[in-house]
Amino acid sequence: MSDKSELKAELERKKQRLAQIREEKKRKEEERKKKEAELKKDAVPLQDDSDLEKKRREADALLQSMGITSDVSAAPAPMSPTAKSVGSPSEAGSQDSGDGTTGPRTLHWDCDPSTVLLHSELGRGPLKLAMTKMTHVDFPPKEVVSYTKETQTPTMTEQKDEEDEEEETPAAQPEAETEKEKPEEKQVEEALPHELTEEEKLQILHSEEFMDFFDHSTRIVERALSEHVDVFFDYSGRDMEEKEGEMQAGTKLSLNRKFVDDRWSKQRVVTCLDWSPQYPELLVASYNNNEEAPHEPDGVALVWNMKYKKATPEYVFHCQSAVMSAAFAKFHPNLVVGGTYSGQIVLWDNRSNRRTPVQRTPLSAAAHTHPVYCVNVVGTQNAHNLISISTDGKMCSWSLDMLSQPQDSMELVFKQSKSVAVTSMSFPLGDVNNFVVGSEDGSVYTASRHGSRAGISEMFEGHHGPITGIHCHTAAGPVDFSHLFLTASFDWTVKLWSNKNNKPLYSFEDNSDYVYDVMWSPVHPALFACVDGLGRVDLWNLNNDTEVPTASVAVDGSPALNRLRWSQSGREIAVGDSEGQIHIYDVGEQIAVPRNDEWTRFVRTLVEINENRDDAEELAAQRLAA
């Protein structure tokens, strides 16, 4: 009970204390409000007093100037240190005007020095003054900036001071910089990566990400390092007189590049060439086996790049059998097709890190079991096939998506008895059904893939040795020459044919060795090229001459030239030899680029050739009769 009563008493005391605090606070608030009201009342007459006093001072000054003194004592007696003045702070403050003049009242000094009474002439009572401490505050004048077209320049003294300061500061900077660099060096030393172990290094080197990066980056670096620019080239043409001989030679045939790789192509025979339809600078070459390197793969296909001056192939592909033919998949820019000596068709993909084929055909009776010298992709973007023919006369049609079995196969047999040993094949321009083939027996055959007369239809005789190359006319123009084709043979000749006549139209007999390959220009109707076993490249323009080549060049070392291939533009020829080298020749503009009348001129040339052939046949018949 006693605890409860004490608690109640304590609460009562606290309540009383709170009530007292509230009352005192309320009383102080009322006093403050009263003082504010009084100050507001006094503020208005002060302004009037100040105006009145100002006028009075002016009057006194006027009287003094006239020699009349005022009643007010000019110099009051000094106040004693003990004198005290009582007054309102607000009134004391109001006496200080803005310009530092005295207040607006007349002062009357009392005889008693201890007190000073201020009597207001306006009828106010005496005010007590008190000593106050004044705080002096300086306000800088407002800066006025005027934006005019005048030139504002600082004084030279300020500039010199700033320059002196700038000259003095760098002297102290090196020490501070060295101090800052020390901790940074410590941080760099601490952030150094740890030393990799041999196992970790091997793991990184064999990772797929590193292989992709290394393969891609080395190609780019190699291209950059291989570029050569002629910094002395003169665009004004002043040096053309000196180069006149070179320019004349350039109008015919001039060596541009030579591709050879010590490991992959040296001591190998170039068996086939093909330019990429999508990337005109890429050239694929297939190679036979290297007898001096039995541990290397027998078959190699290299993709060379004409765009960059590097000496190594862009891609290296290989397989376990010698590659006898190769071609870019016409509608697949990443695929390369190869025909091998074992009879397999292989497919490489440059998107894969593998150098070995991503697909291959089986070695079975359903596919090829003899060397494949002919592969070609025919058709359109949405409907195309890979056509391959082996030396046993078997033709297969494949889908590039599935090489496990052919879509169609056919035995090329003449008159149901004689199997054709095909060595070369060519399709006319724009035709995917009819084609011509050359054989080991020296005969040429026309054939078709489909229809009532599928297979071999006609035989053309004229060569006295195996046919090494055959090519149909491909230059498109106002006149259709797709019925014409050329053949090259071991009998040292090149022959011109028409599928409308089973006898050759003309025989070009300027060579003195095996002629290994022949090909029409893709842009000029009357121009073709051929290569022989003595290392000679010949260009024939039938509109100019049919007896001797228009241009001819011999390769250094006179290696046997096995294959040639025109570029799509008709301005370059790629030639492969028996030593694994590929020579790129530039064809001069005067030869390579056809004029507008070349097609009509070639028609007249063919008419003359036919007339001469008929005359020769009549003459031969007369001699036989005699």
Curated annotation (Swiss-Prot):
Residues 160-169 have a biased composition (Acidic residues). The keyword tRNA-binding does not apply. It is found in: Cytoplasm, Cytoskeleton; Cytoplasm. Residues 20-108, 142-197 are annotated as: Disordered. GO terms for cellular component: cytoplasm; cytoplasmic dynein complex. Residues 20-43, 177-197 have a biased composition (Basic and acidic residues). Residues 82-99 have a biased composition (Polar residues). GO terms for biological process: microtubule-based movement. Disruption phenotype: Morphant embryos display defective craniofacial patterning, microcephaly, a marked disorganization of axonal patterning in the head, reduced number of axon tracts crossing the dorsal midline, and increased cell death. It comes from the Eukaryota. Its main location: cytoplasm. Keywords: Cytoplasm, Cytoskeleton, Repeat, WD repeat. Gene3D superfamilies: YVTN repeat-like/Quinoprotein amine dehydrogenase. WD repeats lie at residues 265-314, 318-358, 367-408, 417-457, 462-507, 510-550, 556-595. InterPro entries: DYNC1I1/DYNC1I2, Dynein_IC, WD40/YVTN_repeat-like_dom_sf, WD40_repeat_dom_sf, WD40_rpt. Acts as one of several non-catalytic accessory components of the cytoplasmic dynein 1 complex that are thought to be involved in linking dynein to cargos and to adapter proteins that regulate dynein function. Cytoplasmic dynein 1 acts as a motor for the intracellular retrograde motility of vesicles and organelles along microtubules. Plays a role in the development of anterior brain and cartilaginous structures. PANTHER family: CYTOPLASMIC DYNEIN 1 INTERMEDIATE CHAIN 2 (PTHR12442:SF37), DYNEIN INTERMEDIATE CHAIN (PTHR12442). Belongs to the dynein intermediate chain family. Homodimer. The cytoplasmic dynein 1 complex consists of two catalytic heavy chains (HCs) and a number of non-catalytic subunits presented by intermediate chains (ICs), light intermediate chains (LICs) and light chains (LCs); the composition seems to vary in respect to the IC, LIC and LC composition. The heavy chain homodimer serves as a scaffold for the probable homodimeric assembly of the respective non-catalytic subunits. The ICs and LICs bind directly to the HC dimer and the LCs assemble on the IC dimer. This is Dynein, cytoplasmic 1, intermediate chain 2a. The gene is dync1i2a.
